[in-house]
């Protein structure tokens, strides 16, 4: 399950998974998704804390670089919200 974290001005939606526990190692997957003018979506997923890209469809290298910088500034918050099941908004 993924929980919405934020929507950027360019309509990119960033969402995160719950905490995944693999042999005592905690990780979070972060999904980036944006509508394409041709139809469908640009989509990419990155695993934290390794910053390993799991897949990427249609995002440019510049986009991925921006997302990596975003993740570097938000990883601690994404882990925090992942541990409590997403941001609680009414």
Give, region by region, the residue ranges found by the protein language model.
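Acidic, low-complexity intrinsically disordered segments
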Residues: 56-90
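Negatively charged, low-complexity tracts enriched in Asp/Glu with abundant Ser/Thr
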Residues: 1-19
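Generic intrinsically disordered, low-complexity segments enriched for polar/acidic and small residues
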Residues: 2, 13, 29, 56, ...
């Amino acid at each position: 399950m993924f929980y919405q974290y934020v929507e950027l001005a360019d309509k990119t939606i960033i969402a995160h998974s719950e905490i995944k526990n693999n042999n005592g190692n905690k990780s979070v997957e972060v999904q980036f998704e944006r509508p394409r003018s041709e139809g469908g979506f640009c989509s990419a997923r990155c695993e934290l804390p390794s910053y390993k890209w799991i897949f990427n469809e249609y995002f440019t290298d510049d986009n991925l670089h921006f997302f990596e910088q975003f993740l570097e500034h938000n990883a601690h918050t994404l882990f925090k919200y992942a541990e409590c099941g997403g941001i609680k908004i009414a």
